[in-house]
Structure formats: C-alpha cells, structure tokens
Amino acid sequence: ALRGLSHHLGDTNDSSFTHDLHKGLYFDYIMANPPFNLKGWYDENLKTDARWSDYGIPPESNANYAWILHILSHLKPANGVAGFLLANGALNDGDTLEIRKKLIQNDKVEAIIVLPRELFITTDISVTLWILNQNKKGGKFQGRTLRNREHEILFMDLRQWRENSVKGESKKKIRLDESQIAHAVNIYHTW
C-alpha cells in the first residue's frame, strides 16, 4: 500500500494506457507525469480505440499525444480539468500537428506553461505543464467567479526562472521557490 492506498488497481494486471481498463470512468481532475517521448507503445489493437476517435491515431513513434488523448478521454465532459507534464517537443512535433489543431479547435487547451530546464533529477530538458479544461465558460466554480475563457489559451514561459540552483549529487538542479510558484499561480488565476 502507498500511504494507505490499496495496491489492487483492477481485475487485470495490465497497462491501462494500452488496454484502457477504466472505460466509462470520468474524473473532475487528473494530474499526470507520463513518461516523456515513450517509444514502442503502439499495438495494432489500438487502431480503432475510442480514445482517438475525435482526434486521429497518435503516431506510433511517440506516445505523448496518446497520453494526452487518454487523459482527455477520462475527464468529466462537463467540467473536467487536467494538468500534466510533457517534454517541450510535444508543442511542435510535426507528426501530431493535426491532433494539436483539433485540441485547440475543440477548445480543450487552457494553458501551456514552459518550465525551466534542470527541474528533474533524471533529465536536464525543459518540460511543459499542459492544462486541459472541458469547460472554459465563465461562471461560478468552487466559490470563485471565472470569466469566459473560451477560445483563449494562456501561455507562460518560465524558462528564465533559474535563480534557485541546488547542487545535486552529480548535477546542478533548479528549484522553484514558494514565491515563484505563488506568482505563477496568481498569473494563472488572474487570467
């Protein structure tokens, strides 16, 4: 058990990514840090998978957009929100241009936040925090009044926020401090 959570995650010991074990389950919020640029993920059985039906089949060479569509397929259609990290290459990969266009045309992308390099222990690349939102209309939401954000996307580039260098075992790493995080959150909420 992890912090009191049962290890039983379903009737089958299988990957819910390549064999969706949670069809019909929808969530208010999803947070994820999927493997960046995963290769070898594709299986011929996925060709007709419902998760791609509105967007097209993600490229076999890289699972980034398969993860995006997997996450989107499990958000509550009325008001689900997701936040997840992907390698920056997902923003301009030519093989995923049509899927990216449809995500924007369908008004699913709320924010793209490019983070500084060297935040992760395992890689030095800069990554992007994506925020998807099923409902960008204004109104009351959890005690807050939100303005209508339909057909708008917030872009934040935090790559220059590199002041807080921390020496690791073998490499220098960057850590965002509480004031930087609060500033980014304030920009997002004010927008």
Where are these regions (language model features)?
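S-adenosyl-L-methionine
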Residues: A1-L25
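A conserved structural/catalytic subdomain of Rossmann-like adenosyl-cofactor enzymes
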Residues: K23-W191
